[in-house]
C-alpha cells in the first residue's frame, strides 16, 4: 500500500511514520509513505499558501492551486508505479465521522492520499474537484489536519499484512467486532492490593474467552450504549449455539420477550429482562 500526506508540515508527519511499529514496518517496505510540502507547489515568490476568505470572516483559507498541483503530481507518481488512482481524503472538521469500519475500508485501497487542512480551511473548489470524501476524527477542532491525518494513517497502516506481529493483534481490539476491548493485566499478580482476576490465571482458555467476552460486552454497554445496541441487533437469538436456543424458543411468550431474551442470551443482561420476565422464567432460560 502507498499512503501520501499533503501538508504544510511534512517533517512532523514523516517523523511519526518513521517511529515505533510503523517505522519498523516502513523500513521493511511493508508499505510506502510520502509526505508532500504544499509550499513546493505554489506559484508565487513568497511561497504563500493562503489568503483571506471571500465573504469575510476571521482566519485564512488555503489556496486550491498548490494542493491541486500536488495531488496531480501524486497521481502521476502512482500511475508510473502501475498503481490505481489514489483515493483522496480531505481531513476536515465538517467531514463524516471516522471509525474502525472506515479504517478497514481505506486499508483495502492500493493508494490513499490524505490532505491536511490548516488555518480556517481549504478552498472548497479543490475538495470538490479532487476529493473522494471528507473525514473528521471527532467532534472537536484542531489547529491543523496533521494530527487527524496521522490518526487515519496509523489506523489504516496497522491493518496491512505484516505490520503487526499477529493478525489477532487487531482482531481482539476495541471496535473490531463492534465492542470495546476487555481489560488487560500483566505481572505482578497483586499490585498495591489489587489482584488479577483469578480466571486469567487458570490456563483454561475457554473460560478465559468467556470472561473476556462478558467483560467486553459489559464495558461496551456501560460506556458506549450506541455500540452495544448495534451489537445486540447484529447478534440475534438464532445465531447463538443450539444449547442456548433449543429450549429457550419454546419458552418465549411474545415478540417483546423474544427481543429481550435475545439480548439476555447474548450477554447475560438480566436486569433488562427483569420488568418483563420473572426470576423463575429467567432461571429456565439459562441452562
Where do the PLM segments sit?
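Conserved GNAT-fold acetyl-CoA-binding loop/helix
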Residues: 252, 269-287
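Structured adenosyl-cofactor binding patch, chiefly the S-adenosyl-L-methionine
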Residues: 122, 126-173
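SAM-dependent methyltransferases
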Residues: 184, 188-249, 262
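S-adenosyl-L-methionine/SAH cofactor-binding core of RNA-modifying enzymes
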Residues: 63-118
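N-terminal nucleotide/polyanion-binding subdomain common to many enzyme families
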Residues: 1-80, 205-229
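Hydrophobic/aromatic beta-strand patches that form the interior of the parallel beta-sheet core
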Residues: 4-6, 34-36, 89, 112-113, ...
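Internal, active-site/partner-interface "lid" segment
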Residues: 147, 159-198
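A short beta-loop-alpha structural element at the N-terminal edge
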Residues: 248-265, 272-274
Amino acid at each position: 500500500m502507498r499512503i501520501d500526506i499533503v501538508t504544510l508540515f511534512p517533517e512532523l508527519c514523516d517523523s511519526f511514520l518513521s517511529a515505533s511499529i510503523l517505522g519498523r514496518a516502513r523500513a521493511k517496505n511493508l508499505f510506502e509513505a510520502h509526505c508532500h510540502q504544499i509550499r513546493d507547489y505554489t506559484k508565487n515568490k513568497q511561497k504563500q499558501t493562503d489568503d483571506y476568505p471571500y465573504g469575510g470572516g476571521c482566519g485564512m483559507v488555503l489556496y486550491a492551486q498548490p494542493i491541486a498541483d500536488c495531488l496531480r503530481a501524486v497521481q502521476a507518481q502512482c500511475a508510473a508505479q502501475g498503481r490505481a488512482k489514489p483515493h483522496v481524503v480531505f481531513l476536515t472538521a465538517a467531514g463524516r465521522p471516522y471509525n474502525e469500519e472506515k479504517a478497514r475500508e481505506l486499508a483495502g485501497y492500493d493508494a490513499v492520499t490524505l490532505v491536511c487542512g490548516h488555518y480556517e480551511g481549504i478552498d472548497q473548489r479543490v475538495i470538490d474537484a479532487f476529493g473522494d470524501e471528507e473525514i473528521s476524527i471527532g467532534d472537536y477542532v484542531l489547529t491543523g489536519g496533521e494530527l487527524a491525518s496521522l490518526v487515519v494513517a496509523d489506523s489504516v497502516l496497522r491493518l496491512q499484512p505484516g505490520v503487526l506481529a499477529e493478525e489477532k493483534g487487531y482482531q481482539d481490539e476495541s471496535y473490531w467486532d463492534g465492542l470495546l476491548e476487555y481489560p488487560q493485566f500483566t505481572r505482578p499478580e497483586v499490585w498495591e492490593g489489587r489482584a488479577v482476576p483469578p480466571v486469567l490465571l487458570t490456563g483454561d482458555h475457554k473460560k478465559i474467552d468467556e470472561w473476556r467476552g462478558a467483560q467486553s460486552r459489559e464495558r461496551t454497554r456501560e460506556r458506549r450504549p450506541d455500540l452495544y445496541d448495534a451489537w445486540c441487533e447484529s447478534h440475534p437469538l438464532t445465531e447463538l449455539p443450539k444449547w442456548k436456543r433449543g429450549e429457550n424458543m419454546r419458552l418465549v411468550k411474545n415478540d417483546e420477550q423474544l427481543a429481550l431474551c435475545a439480548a439476555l442470551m447474548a450477554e447475560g443482561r438480566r436486569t433488562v429482562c427483569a420488568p418483563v420476565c420473572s426470576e423463575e422464567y429467567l432461571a429456565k432460560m439459562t441452562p
